[in-house]
């Protein structure tokens, strides 16, 4: 960054913002880079501001029982705030004085008062000086207030972040990431945007008082009629605003539903294409969009009437002010024109400034109170340790995740017994109190000496991670003692990668030791991975390590923990993402050898690990099931294996979570997805499992919880909240374990708003910061907002301060028209936080974009022409009125009822002034009617254009090739459908309307002034030229600075989320100061862009006013010097000239707003222009109902006869297959060749990242591929994509359950009747599951099907494949995270329903390969071997090395006959699973 010219700028340069000229010049000539931005002043640095506020806040905490954050802010910023407030008031006073001088100038032209004619020139000079003074006062004041608001935001940003790093885990469990981001963005933005308006809460009343005093002198009591009219207008606007909000609130549900479906589709676009569901998904979204747009139009119409009413109110305010006076006294032009000027200022004060100021204070005080509450939350306390000890000891330790719940639970339980409270929904708190009061750990005892290895095992939710958290100090024990030596290193089971290089992630601030570093890299099997990067270990890892596989991230996290020299190493399931061979090597070389002399606590369930551990601790439901050695375990606890069954299924998380933050944040927790539910309701729907069901599932691994329970699906829809609130209803749903339910969320336990009441162990997944920390996701930074079930808040898709608002009035109006989309957090802020990226879009919107936008709908061009015609009609009507005022009618002095006093001279007779009054009312009504007719079709047409563009963009995205979509982030795509679509729906139509309205007013006013005084036209031409030139000069720099500011905002929130994800690791390593410094650096970067934008913005505003002042000086002296007799003409000219100033500024602001908003249109067009997948068929052929493809599909294939049915057998031939993710990318698979016989089952083998899943994608033509693939002799390039993909049934690794009914998820095209669907549900064992839900097939699944276990989701995918009648089945690790029972069900279904199908199976589990006849071994992106099981076992390859002797014994029956499964085994399998298939757990 460059040094700021502000440091050496003179006072004059600072006053006129001339020091910004270098950056403006550079931005106009070339694209700005980050290096071009100026450094911030030291007074604005985050370190300085946070230190000042933190000192005052600490002082407040120390001195008072009830500390107030506003007092700390007052001591920091009050005097500067008041100084700029006084400047602002003085600037506003000049606006009230100007009409007085105008009245004196008009009076000097009274033919009966020629004495004052000589002073008109001096009055004109005074009027011009007032404009100059106003400019010099207002702009520094507004800039200073914006600057103070920025400083307040920075200081509180830092304070909140520091507090976040100190919060206890108990508090983090109650706060969602959405609330935190909202606290930082939505609440704190109020200071940036609203502080300049805050002073009007006292300025506006003083202004109104002054103006009413001046109007009283002119009109006497008649002035109050005008004030009453303004108050009525303000109340009417408030009423229309409430009506508009009602429509937007109704629309919020539809928008959320659409965004949920859209986000699910974007995240699972590969599955959508594999299932050929593009058209079904498109139709589903369009149906939601249709209803949404109806409500959008209603809200837009009300908003339009509101805006039109403001523009038209000026006529009627003057009318009500002048009419009573006119009836009594007659028309006096001097008073009329003076009154008009006063009313314009009065209108702004009453209808804009004061209401906005009150709202600003209300919002700001609310935001400060929320931040104040947050800053007083409980903090994390480091566990005390003993440096003299060498052992780790726990004695009688009991712990609750909720502080003080032990005592509270005992008291409540005793009260419950005494009162005999029933277990019903009406007493939900007490019926679930066993859930709340159950300790996460109970009476834990163990002791390990230095250098020993303790293995902790147990089923999901047993308390393994909680035990490690106790050692870290994250969980405080309620009872017992903990002792350790103090130096701890920690490896979380949820891989956390901070932004930086691989080396920085491993060293993590510890002193660099080359030998130790290399040893750790080698022991963690990272040498080969690092060697593949061109930059080796200096390669930069962005956004949570998106470029790494899950296994690579896990190994880097393990290396980080091992590299630190500590006394105690806590390793929480570090091998979850690793293949069998890599896991075996790391355990031996790293855990057993490199760390042999260190004390280690390892969470694991592998039998091999337990055998080598010095001590074993098995936890069950929070209690110690066993503690001792492995030999003691075998002797004393022979049934221990039952406590571990299913552990692998649920404790290891895949790299890509189905329920990623991106999808979870947009969830609506309702049962009815098609209705917008009032926010103050709580909707419940309960259903009870039968006793028979519970008995059958009682001992199932799928359901370790006793199953005879009552479930209550709760839709919480409380009132609006704007921050972090304590939920009074929340105790009914508490989390008891840090361990999430399952990989796909929900394998065992209900989640979110599903309350599971059981006698022994219950919990729910909280969407909290704690949950964020325990959720591993590749897309960890692709967060829009985390939905909070019990709390909701307002959010706007209108960019907050993003529309290049050029003054505080028009800026507030633009925000007032923003889209209120949901009652949660500010979605727009979140989206901009995480998804704004460098765009290949011009700095200024091109004319081609405007042309494409205008021609997108044929009626829009005609509407624009219609607007122009009506404008000409309005100008003509206005000229009629002016003609009557301009020409003085004949006067009958004898019949005149008025006085001939010079100060009250009448221009017309008593008869004619009523005639003029009728003309005035008629013209005003006509202008209002014409304006209404003009604007309404325009707004309607623009919304229709938005509908068309959204449809085209959705179609383009769904049909774009994966090579194109792989280049885009999911958040970037979703931004187009959320932020940009909202701009097209709401802001752009009304901003265009405002701009057209204002531009026409300015043009009309200039035309009228030029008609009245042609000489003024000569001054108008250069002024308009100067305005256009100035705008063209400023706009490129403005847009680029806004883009840089937006990009600078992203690291702030990305760093926040990154810190929260790794908070346990940060604390364990003591890296909080380092991350605070990084956060301040990100804040300073954003501040540099924002401060420069504010400065250039004020430079532009001052130049606009300076140009206008020159224009007004010219108009004033031309009219004074050239106008003869007739005060009417001078009054009209000067009044219109004064009004042109504010209107022209507003019009210029709107023009820049339009250009800024049109960038969203450019982004939408960029997506519309994406290439589409190759397809010879333009018409979608839906799946047929029988066991074949329709004849229409095969006619297009020249290689298939019309009477043939393809595919028949499922024979596949692959020759020289090469696959790439992008057109110009490196080959992911090279020269893959093999063949599969009809009905054969092929297993894909290879270590993590070898290309197994890539091969399955290539077979579906989801990647850029070269080579040849044939199915039954038909080549893949001779059929359409739809034909080809329908030949496959798919069970993807990433399970796709979209928000919709069971029926929609199974049959989105509605091709099958209920009988056929139930038949398939029976085959896969889903009938009993579906029947447990109200509505059965019509039950709406939300949140990725959170009420289903991961196993049931797999069965749902299996049912889709059965319905598709596919001849080839592709399975990508279908057994991952499955319990044994569900896995056996899937195996049975595959054997029965797909007995004659070709199956290609990718698996890590050895036992999952028992049914395969051939195996394809992939190494280094190539085929290593393609052979039968016998040959694979007889040769020394990785497959054999990865197997334990036990695995080999399992495969012995298959060495002699790999084609046929032993009938005895089949019979045993049937007997084992028959009962489980019939009844499966809900």
UniProtKB/Swiss-Prot annotation:
Enzyme Commission code(s) on record: 5.6.1.6
Enzyme class label: isomerase
Gene Ontology CC entries for this record: apical plasma membrane; chloride channel complex; cytosol; early endosome; early endosome membrane; endoplasmic reticulum membrane; membrane; nucleus
The reaction(s) this protein catalyses: ATP + H2O + closed Cl(-) channel = ADP + phosphate + open Cl(-) channel; chloride(in) = chloride(out); hydrogencarbonate(in) = hydrogencarbonate(out); ATP + H2O = ADP + phosphate + H(+)
Start-end of Acidic residues biased regions: 1472-1482
Localization annotation: Apical cell membrane; Early endosome membrane; Cell membrane; Recycling endosome membrane
PROSITE patterns: ABC_TM1F (PS50929), ABC_TRANSPORTER_1 (PS00211), ABC_TRANSPORTER_2 (PS50893)
Binding site for ATP 1: 401, 434, 458-465, 493
Binding residue positions for ATP 2: 1221, 1246-1253
Disulfide bonds listed in the record: none
Compositionally skewed regions (Basic residues) per UniProt: 1453-1463
Phosphothreonine sites (modified residues): 717
Cytoplasmic side: 1-77, 147-195, 244-298, 359-859, 941-991, 1036-1096, 1153-1482
Lipidation positions, renumbered (S-palmitoyl cysteine): 524, 1397
Cross-link Glycyl lysine isopeptide (Lys-Gly) (interchain with G-Cter in ubiquitin), where in sequence: 688
Disordered as annotated region, ranges: 1453-1482
Family: Belongs to the ABC transporter superfamily. ABCC family. CFTR transporter (TC 3.A.1.202) subfamily.
Classification via PANTHER family: ATP-BINDING CASSETTE SUB-FAMILY C, CYSTIC FIBROSIS TRANSMEMBRANE CONDUCTANCE REGULATOR
Protein role: Epithelial ion channel that plays an important role in the regulation of epithelial ion and water transport and fluid homeostasis. Mediates the transport of chloride ions across the cell membrane. Possesses an intrinsic ATPase activity and utilizes ATP to gate its channel; the passive flow of anions through the channel is gated by cycles of ATP binding and hydrolysis by the ATP-binding domains. The ion channel is also permeable to HCO(3)(-); selectivity depends on the extracellular chloride concentration.
Name of this chain's protein: Cystic fibrosis transmembrane conductance regulator
Chain's gene name: CFTR
């Amino acid at each position: 960054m460059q040094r700021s010219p502000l440091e050496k700028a003179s006072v004059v340069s600072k006053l006129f913002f001339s020091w910004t000229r270098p950056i403006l010049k550079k931005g106009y000539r070339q694209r700005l880079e980050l290096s071009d931005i100026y450094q911030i002043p030291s007074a604005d640095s985050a370190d300085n501001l946070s230190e000042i506020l933190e000192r005052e806040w600490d002082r407040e905490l120390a001195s008072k029982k009830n500390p107030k954050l506003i007092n700390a802010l007052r001591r920091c910023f009050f005097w500067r705030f008041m100084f700029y407030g006084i400047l602002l008031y003085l600037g506003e006073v000049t606006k009230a004085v100007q009409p007085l001088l105008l009245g004196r100038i008009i009076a000097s032209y009274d033919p009966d008062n020629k004495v004052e004619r000589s002073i008109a020139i001096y009055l004109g000079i005074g009027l011009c000086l007032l404009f100059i003074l106003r400019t010099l006062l207002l702009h520094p004041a507004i800039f200073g207030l914006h600057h103070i608001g920025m400083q307040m935001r920075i200081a509180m940003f830092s304070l909140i972040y520091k507090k976040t790093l100190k919060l206890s885990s108990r508090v983090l469990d109650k706060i969602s990431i959405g609330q935190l981001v909202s606290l930082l963005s939505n609440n704190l933005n109020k200071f940036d945007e609203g502080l300049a308006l805050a002073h009007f809460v006292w300025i506006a009343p003083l202004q109104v008082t002054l103006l009413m005093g001046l109007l009283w002198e002119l009109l006497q009591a008649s002035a109050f009629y005008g004030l009453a009219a303004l108050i009525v207008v303000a109340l009417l606007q408030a009423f229309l605003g409430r009506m508009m909000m009602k429509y937007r609130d109704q629309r919020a549900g539809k928008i959320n539903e659409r965004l949920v479906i859209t986000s699910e589709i974007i995240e699972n676009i590969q599955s959508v294409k594999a299932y050929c569901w593009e058209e079904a998904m498109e139709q589903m979204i369009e149906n939601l969009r249709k209803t949404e747009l109806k409500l959008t139009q209603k809200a837009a119409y009300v908003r339009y009437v509101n805006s039109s009413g403001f523009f038209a109110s000026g006529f009627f305010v003057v009318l009500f002010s002048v009419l009573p006076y006119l009836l009594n006294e007659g028309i006096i032009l001097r008073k009329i024109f003076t009154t008009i000027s006063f009313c314009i200022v009065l209108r702004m004060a009453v209808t804009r400034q004061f209401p906005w100021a009150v709202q600003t204070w209300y919002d700001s005080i609310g935001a400060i109170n929320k931040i104040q509450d947050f800053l007083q939350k409980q903090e994390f306390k480091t566990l005390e340790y003993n440096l003299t000890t060498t052992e780790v000891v726990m004695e009688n330790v009991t712990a609750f995740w909720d502080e003080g719940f032990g005592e509270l639970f005992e008291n409540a339980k005793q009260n419950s017994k005494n009162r005999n409270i029933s277990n019903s929904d009406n007493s939900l708190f007490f019926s679930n109190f066993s859930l709340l009061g159950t300790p996460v750990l109970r009476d834990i005892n163990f002791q390990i000496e230095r250098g020993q290895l303790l293995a902790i095992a147990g089923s999901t939710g047993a308390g393994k991670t909680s035990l490690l958290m106790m050692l870290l100090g994250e969980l405080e024990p309620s009872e017992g003692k903990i002792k350790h030596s103090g130096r701890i290193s920690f490896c979380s089971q949820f891989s956390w990668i901070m932004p930086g290089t691989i080396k920085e992630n491993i060293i993590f601030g510890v002193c660099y030791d080359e030998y130790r570093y290399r040893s750790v890299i080698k022991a963690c099997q990272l040498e080969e991975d690092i060697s593949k990067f061109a930059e080796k270990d200096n390669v930069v890892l962005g956004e949570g390590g998106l470029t790494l596989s899950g296994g690579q991230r896990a190994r880097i996290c393990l290396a980080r923990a091992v590299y630190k020299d500590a006394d105690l190493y806590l390793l929480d399931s570090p091998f979850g993402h690793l293949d069998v061979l890599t896991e075996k090597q790391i355990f031996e070389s790293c855990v057993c050898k490199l760390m042999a002399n260190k004390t280690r606590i390892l969470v694991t369930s592998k039998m091999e690990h337990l055998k080598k551990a010095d001590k074993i601790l098995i936890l069950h439901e929070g209690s110690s099931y066993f503690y001792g050695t492995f030999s003691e375990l075998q002797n004393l606890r022979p049934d221990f294996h039952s406590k571990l069954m299913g552990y692998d299924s649920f404790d290891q998380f895949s790299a890509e979570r189905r329920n990623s933050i991106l999808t979870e944040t947009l969830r609506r927790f309702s049962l009815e997805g098609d209705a917008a539910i009032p926010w103050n309701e709580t909707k419940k729907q309960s259903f009870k499992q039968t006793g028979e069901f519970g008995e059958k599932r009682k001992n199932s691994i799928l359901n370790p919880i006793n199953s005879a329970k009552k479930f209550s699906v709760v839709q919480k829809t409380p009132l609006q909240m704007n921050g972090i609130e304590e939920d009074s209803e929340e105790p009914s749903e508490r989390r008891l374990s840090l361990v999430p339910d399952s990989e796909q969320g929900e394998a065992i336990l209900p989640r979110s708003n599903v309350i599971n009441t059981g006698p022994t162990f219950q919990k729910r997944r909280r969407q909290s910061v704690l949950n964020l920390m325990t959720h591993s996701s590749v897309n960890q930074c692709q967060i829009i907002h985390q939905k909070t079930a019990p709390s909701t808040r307002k959010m706007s898709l209108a960019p907050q301060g993003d529309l290049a608002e050029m003054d505080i009035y028009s800026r507030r109006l633009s925000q007032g028209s923003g889209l209120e989309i949901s009652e949660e957090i500010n979605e727009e802020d979140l989206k901009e936080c995480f998804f704004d990226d460098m765009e290949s879009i011009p700095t200024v919107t091109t004319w081609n974009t405007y042309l494409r936008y205008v021609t997108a709908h044929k009626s829009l061009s005609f509407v624009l022409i219609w607007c122009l015609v009506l404008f000409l009609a309005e100008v003509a009507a206005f000229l009629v009125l002016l003609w009557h005022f301009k020409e003085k009618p004949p006067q009958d002095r004898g019949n005149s009822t008025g006085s001939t006093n010079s100060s009250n001279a009448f221009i017309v007779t008593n008869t004619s002034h009523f005639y003029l009054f009728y003309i005035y009312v008629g013209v005003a009504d006509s202008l209002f009617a014409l304006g209404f007719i003009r604007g309404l079709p325009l707004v309607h047409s623009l919304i229709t254009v938005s509908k068309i563009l959204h449809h085209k963009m959705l179609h383009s995205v769904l049909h774009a090739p994966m090579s194109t979509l792989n280049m885009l982030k999911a958040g970037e795509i979703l931004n187009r459908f959320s932020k940009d679509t909202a701009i097209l729906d709401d802001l752009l139509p009304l901003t265009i309307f405002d701009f057209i309205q204002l531009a026409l007013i300015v043009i009309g006013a200039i035309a009228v002034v030029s008609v009245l005084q042609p000489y003024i036209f000569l001054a108008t031409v250069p002024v308009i030229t100067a305005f256009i030139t100035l705008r063209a000069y400023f706009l490129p720099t403005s847009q680029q600075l806004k883009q840089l500011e937006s990009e600078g905002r992203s690291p702030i929130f990305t760093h926040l989320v990154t810190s929260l994800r790794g908070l346990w690791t940060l604390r364990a390593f003591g890296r909080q100061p380092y991350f605070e410094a990084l956060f301040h650096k990100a804040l300073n970067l954003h501040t540099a862009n924002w401060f420069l934008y504010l400065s250039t913005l004020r430079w532009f505003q001052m130049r606009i006013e300076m140009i206008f002042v020159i224009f007004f000086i010219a108009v004033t002296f031309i009219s004074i010097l050239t106008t003869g007799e007739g005060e009417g003409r001078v009054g009209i000219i000067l009044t219109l000239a004064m009004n042109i100033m504010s209107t022209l500024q507003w019009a210029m602001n709107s023009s820049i707003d339009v250009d800024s908003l049109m960038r969203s249109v450019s982004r939408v067009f960029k997506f519309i222009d994406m290439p589409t997948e190759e397809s010879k068929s333009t018409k979608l052929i839906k799946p047929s109902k029988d066991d074949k493809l329709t004849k229409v599909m095969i006619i297009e294939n020249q290689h298939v006869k019309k009477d043939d049915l393809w595919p028949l057998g499922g024979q596949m031939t692959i020759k020289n297959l090469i696959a790439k993710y992008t057109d110009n990318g490196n080959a992911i698979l090279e020269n893959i060749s093999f063949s599969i016989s009809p009905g054969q089952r092929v297993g894909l083998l290879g270590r993590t990242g070898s290309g197994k899943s890539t091969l399955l994608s290539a077979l579906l033509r989801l990647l850029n591929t070269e080579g040849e693939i044939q199915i039954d002799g038909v080549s893949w390039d001779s059929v359409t994509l739809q034909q080809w993909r329908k030949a496959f049934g798919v069970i993807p690794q990433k399970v796709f359950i979209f928000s919709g009914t069971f029926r929609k998820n199974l049959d989105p095209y509605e091709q099958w009747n209920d009988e056929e669907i139930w038949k398939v549900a029976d085959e896969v064992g889903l009938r009993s599951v579906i029947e447990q839900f109200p509505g059965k097939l019509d039950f709406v699944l939300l949140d990725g099907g959170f009420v289903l276990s991961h196993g049931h989701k797999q069965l749902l995918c299996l049912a889709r494949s059965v319905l598709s009648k596919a001849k080839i089945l592709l399975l990508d690790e279908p057994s991952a995270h499955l319990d044994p029972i569900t896995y056996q069900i899937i195996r049975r279904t595959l054997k029965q329903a797909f007995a004659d199908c070709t199956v290609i199976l990718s698996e890590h589990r050895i036992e999952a390969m028992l049914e395969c006849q051939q195996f394809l071994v992939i190494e280094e992106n190539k085929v290593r071997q393609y052979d039968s099981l016998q040959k694979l076992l007889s040769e020394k390859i990785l497959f054999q090395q990865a197997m334990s002797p036990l695995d080999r014994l399992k495969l012995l029956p298959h060495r002699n006959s790999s084609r046929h499964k032993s009938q005895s085994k089949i019979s045993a399998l049937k007997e084992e699973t028959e009962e489980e298939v019939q009844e499966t757990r809900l």
